Regions:
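Charged DNA-binding/catalytic regions of mobile-element recombinases
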Residues: 1-322
Length: 322
């Protein structure tokens, strides 16, 4: 190209120069020379922005394990809305939903989708049932006012494992969980004790007479041992109607997300579940993510722990200027 430029500077025509070069076996078109001489065009702002967003989405959606393997991270489960909120919180405050959508489509990310759920709770026939104190109102003015409980199953090579959860309605925080190979009363008693202990450990102990424990009509929750322990702790029992998932809709939603985000992916456990210990390992990772890093749309795209901390921070009297 420099040779052609020198010849042009001496007054020769580009077409003539290129024709002579082609006759000598050098295939150069006049259009190629003119394109080479043309000043480079500035890259469009959208192309630059899309590249930045795509890099940020890739970094958020995949993580490198200690052994150097690239794996999908929990944030890779997000759809467009939550991925946009995540990037605005962490890497790109001005990230647009459109740019995130384009980046996710380019990278083959679409978020996870909920599947069907299977009924695992058998109504208690002999247990005395408490009334429904919530009437499908899954809101609370503060933490430790309403807890919801339920359990689900996970298939393993050794048989079924059952995982019971307790979530605080105020910020949807999972305050306790327990996995076992049988669905006896201990399956739900253990997380209840753990939840009470954990709240005390956080210096946010349950106050007698202030908390409602809501569940479905399963025999584990209507068992005498369970209801007596609630009474001992000053916790009011609440039981939804038989066979109606909407009466415990919040907990059904939590369990549905547990199945979708944890059980049916390899994000929190690589490979099949061989025993209950594998289920415990995966559940521990998912609950930690749920409480501390997962963004919740119903909370304004913050985490349950952030929502609780904001609540307690608002209760601290602000210093008045002198």
């Amino acid at each position: 190209m420099a040779f052609i430029a020198d010849q042009v500077a001496q007054g020769r025509a580009v077409e003539s120069i290129c024709r002579v070069l082609r006759e000598q076996g050098c295939q150069v078109a006049a259009r190629t020379y003119r394109e080479w001489r043309r000043p480079s065009r500035p890259v469009a702002d959208r192309i630059v922005t899309d590249a930045q967003v795509q890099d940020a989405v890739r970094d958020a959606a995949w993580a490198t394990s200690p052994d150097g393997v690239r794996r999908l991270a929990p944030e890779g489960l997000y759809g467009r809305r939550k991925m946009t909120a995540h990037l605005r919180r962490t890497a790109l405050p001005q990230a647009s939903a459109g740019a995130v959508d384009r980046a996710m489509r380019t990278l083959g990310l679409a978020g996870v989708r909920r599947g069907k759920t299977l009924r695992t709770t058998v109504p208690g026939k002999d247990g005395t049932r408490a009334g429904d104190l919530l009437d499908r109102n899954f809101t609370a003015p503060a933490p430790n006012r309403v807890w919801v409980s339920d359990f689900t199953y996970v298939r393993t090579w050794a048989g079924f494992a059952y995982v019971a959860f307790i979530a605080d309605v105020f910020a949807q925080k999972i305050v306790a969980w327990h996995a076992a190979t049988t669905k006896t009363t201990d399956l739900v008693m253990t997380p209840l004790r753990m939840a009470i202990w954990q709240r005390s450990r956080e210096d946010r102990a349950v106050e007698p007479g202030q908390l409602i424990s809501h569940s479905d009509a399963g025999s584990q929750y209507t068992a005498l041992r369970f209801t007596e322990h609630l009474a001992l702790e000053g916790i009011a029992p609440s039981i939804g109607s038989v066979g109606d998932a909407y009466d415990n809709a919040l907990m059904e939603s939590v369990i549905g997300l547990f199945k979708t985000e944890c059980v049916r992916t390899t994000v929190f456990h690589a490979g099949p579940y061989k025993a209950v210990s594998d289920v415990e390992y995966a559940t521990a990772g998912w609950v930690d993510w749920w409480n501390n890093r997962r963004l919740h749309g119903t909370l304004g795209m913050i985490t349950p722990n952030e929502a609780e901390e904001a609540h307690y921070a608002a209760l601290i009297p602000q210093e008045q200027p002198v």
